Regions:
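Bacterial Sec-dependent N-terminal signal peptides
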Residues: 1-20
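Glycan-processing catalytic domains of CAZymes
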Residues: 15-236
């Protein structure tokens, strides 16, 4: 199912930019960040890992008239990534809870922005239609840096400007408290667990703007029990 907030009839975005993809508000979505990508899922929008997905896989999806979001972390350094050694120690902060080998980044630093620009260029060069930059709410976390809400807004808008400048759509991942300030800069929202935490109402501005909201719920019952899954879809 497509899990999204219902707030009445959506309206089309005003003057959509024809230079990058604009997923429709009712798009279907397949997310897979590990393992050999399945290319047989009947979804209009796929999401795969930026680093682990080949240009050949992306071309195969395009041949099936699929669109692709490429996932990467924009707010953390993951020690297993090919460019991990390019992040100076001065921009590496506290570890992410429950994610070994991953630390928060100082998003105010020009070197971090330079490296994220290169990741966006990689997405463009591989043929991704858009990107899903994760961990863009570090100002709310124990990052090891004195990040402010203004720092986060500036960084997230930087990511959106750079992505659009390269012809890429861009999703806002979580960062619920800044949605009203960022909805005009992003093409869709991707959220984790808004039903579990009763936070889905924060996402209404995207639906009102005619932009999709894609939701992930991690509770085992939604994967193992079809009735629970259907109930979740009905509530959404």
């Amino acid at each position: 199912c497509r899990v999204q907030v219902s707030v009445g009839a959506p309206v089309p975005p005003v003057d959509p930019d024809p230079d990058h993809h604009h997923p429709p508000v009712d798009t279907s979505w397949h997310l897979q960040l590990q393992g050999t990508p399945r290319l047989d899922v009947a979804a209009r929008l796929y999401e795969l890992d930026l680093f682990d997905t080949s240009s050949q896989t992306i071309a195969a999806l395009h041949a099936q008239q699929r669109r692709l979001l490429c996932y990467f972390s924009a707010g953390s350094q993951e020690e297993w990534r090919a460019d991990a050694g390019s992040f100076p120690s001065s921009v590496q902060g506290e570890p992410l809870a429950d994610w070994p080998g991953e630390v928060w980044l100082d998003i105010r630093d020009s070197k971090v922005r330079e490296l994220m620009r290169k990741r966006l260029q990689l997405a463009r060069d591989k043929g991704c239609d858009g990107v899903d930059p994760d961990n863009v709410d570090g100002y709310l976390q124990n990052s090891g840096f004195a990040l402010s809400a203004a720092d986060q807004l500036d960084y997230n808008r930087f990511l959106a400007r750079e992505a659009h400048g390269m012809g890429l759509a861009i999703a806002l991942k979580n960062d619920l408290q800044q949605i009203t300030s960022l909805v005009d800069s992003f093409d869709l929202a991707i959220n984790e667990q808004c039903h579990a935490f009763q936070e889905c109402h924060y996402l209404a501005p995207f639906i009102q703007a005619g932009k999709p909201v894609l939701n992930i719920e991690y509770a085992d019952r939604f994967m193992a029990d079809e009735q629970s899954q259907q109930q979740l879809c009905d509530e959404a």
